[in-house]
UniProtKB/Swiss-Prot annotation:
This is Fluconazole resistance protein 1. Residues 26-52 bind DNA. Pfam families: Zn_clus. It comes from the Eukaryota.
């Protein structure tokens, strides 16, 4: 029982470990609302091949200071201020800029104190409080002027962030006896801007070039009288827009780019004398959609307007003749074929014999044209008739009407091959019993005339041999029968069924199993 209890407690411990919650899930698991293991990167982002990011939200919490902390800072600030004033007073004989600042400050205070007593009450309460504080305190030590001089001239706060520069300027010019309320309001506004994230620069480091001035200069350039004439800055297009070569036909020409539909409207409105890209002929969809770099479509050059100027347009030359580019339309290709009568060449039906022993025995037999091509040519010729073109009759060759004529022509060709070059051989066992229609006496006379003496029923494996074979390509194992050239010996061709397929015909030392002659 004790062992079972320990195992049960151990499994419960593992179960509690597995159910441990993760403090924070990654962004991907948070969006998908799936469980995240909290690792960096987590297992699910690793399997999905994604970047695992844990976004931390910054919560603005006010600092909790202990009691008396603010009073302590105020006392410390007062001590540091008095110490700095004492140091400035002691270093005045040694530093010339301190003497100049103190002298200037005294003169300014004297000028402000004299008209302040005679002026009426100010409308602003802040200004009234500052004047009262100034009259009561008198001349203040020029500590703020010294700090401002060190910041601007000596680079006291050179490495601070840019957004804190205005805040330091406000703090440097702060005087609790003069501008307490105004300085506090300005610093609070600056703190809110810095918290949002908008950088605020100081007046001495504001950029000299104003972006609004650039816009106004560009507007003045567009509205200037010279904008009526040629100006590259006006006609220059952006990178995203297509570049079109603009060549004027007169002093007044359009300044924009037109679509093919607008170009057709511009042709109809010739009274406006606006430049049109298509004045010579209608263009097809392929020509209008294609980009011809050779024709100058991608060049942004613009020619200046001249009087009586006739230039090359995109689709015609100076004489107005159309220019056919590389991307000509399919309609022009069809018209080109329709204007010419096409007919298939007359193919050879019967083999041509040659008596020379060195040259080729048979000429190349061309295959008959397909019915599809003949129908296509016929449809083209039917389209030629209403157009008044000269009609030429198609010379269609005659086809072999029966299988017997093909057999006779093939046997005649094979007999000629055997008579001239002696290149016919039966490669299988052939006996006189397998050849009932073969006359041995005639075969002997035939072989004796050709200078062959090796004849017999069992000379080569018990078969009948006629010379050495000279086939460049072996016979197909699918042959069912071979035509034996016996037209000179008998009145009909002899067929020896020694192979296992169809009938092959030798054409230029190559086998054609489809009887394409």
């Amino acid at each position: 029982m004790s062992d079972d209890h320990s195992i049960h407690s151990h499994t419960q411990g593992l179960h509690h470990i597995k159910k441990k919650r993760v403090g924070k899930a990654c962004d991907s698991c948070r969006i998908k609302k799936t469980k995240c293991d909290g690792k960096k990167p987590c297992n699910r982002c690793t399997l999905d091949n994604k970047i695992c990011v844990f976004t931390e939200k910054k919560k603005t919490k006010e600092k909790k200071h202990p009691s008396g902390y603010v009073e302590l800072l105020e006392a410390r600030l007062d001590i540091l201020t008095r110490s700095l004033e004492k140091l400035i007073e002691l270093s005045r004989p040694h530093l010339q800029f301190i003497d100049d600042i103190i002298t200037e400050e005294k003169s300014v205070d004297q000028e402000k104190s004299s008209p302040a007593s005679s002026t009426p009450n100010s409308s602003s309460s802040d200004h009234h409080d500052d004047v009262e504080e100034q009259n009561s305190t008198g001349v203040v030590a020029p500590i703020n002027k010294v700090v401002s001089y060190l910041i601007k001239e000596q680079g006291l706060l050179k490495n601070i962030p840019l957004e804190w520069e205005q805040g330091t300027e406000i703090a440097a010019n702060f005087d609790p006896n003069r501008n307490l309320k105004s300085s506090s309001r300005l610093f609070a506004e600056h703190k809110g801007e810095a918290f949002i994230g908008s950088p605020v620069t100081s007046p001495q480091q504001m950029p000299t070039s104003n972006p609004f001035r650039r816009t106004s200069m560009f507007k003045e350039e567009l509205e200037s009288p010279s904008s009526d004439h040629y100006n590259e800055s006006i006609f220059s297009q952006s990178v995203d827009e297509p570049y079109i070569k603009k060549e004027p036909n007169s002093a007044q020409f359009s300044k924009g780019t037109f679509s093919p539909q607008q170009q057709q409207l511009q042709q109809q409105q010739q009274m406006l004398n606006q430049f049109s890209l298509n004045t010579s002929r209608d263009i097809s969809d392929i020509e209008s959609d294609s980009s011809n770099k050779e024709d100058g479509l991608n060049s942004g050059s613009v020619s200046p307007p001249t009087s009586n100027y006739r230039s090359f347009s995109l689709f015609s030359d100076s004489n107005g003749e159309p220019i056919l580019g590389k991307t000509s339309s399919l309609t022009s290709l069809t018209n080109k074929y329709e204007n010419h009568s096409l007919s298939s060449p007359q193919t050879a039906i019967n083999p041509v014999f040659n008596n020379s022993t060195t040259g080729p025995i048979l000429t190349t037999l061309r295959r008959n044209s397909s019915s599809h091509s003949q129908k296509t040519l016929g449809s083209i010729q039917l389209q030629q008739k209403p157009r008044g073109s000269v009609h030429k009759p198609v010379r269609n060759h005659s086809r072999v009407s029966s299988f017997d004529k093909r057999m006779e022509s093939t046997a005649t060709a094979a007999a000629t091959v055997a008579a001239v070059s002696g290149s016919v051989q039966l490669s299988q066992n052939t006996t006189p019993q397998n050849l009932p229609h073969l006359d041995n006496s005639q075969n002997n006379n035939y072989l004796r005339d050709n200078g062959m003496n090796n004849i017999g029923a069992g000379s080569v494996g018990g078969g009948l041999t006629f010379g050495a074979p000279s086939f460049t390509q072996p016979l197909s194992p699918s042959d069912d029968a071979i035509v034996y050239p016996t037209n000179q010996f008998t009145n009909r061709p002899a067929t020896v069924s020694t192979f296992g397929g169809g009938l092959d015909v030798l054409v230029d030392n190559s086998l054609d199993p489809f009887f394409n002659i």
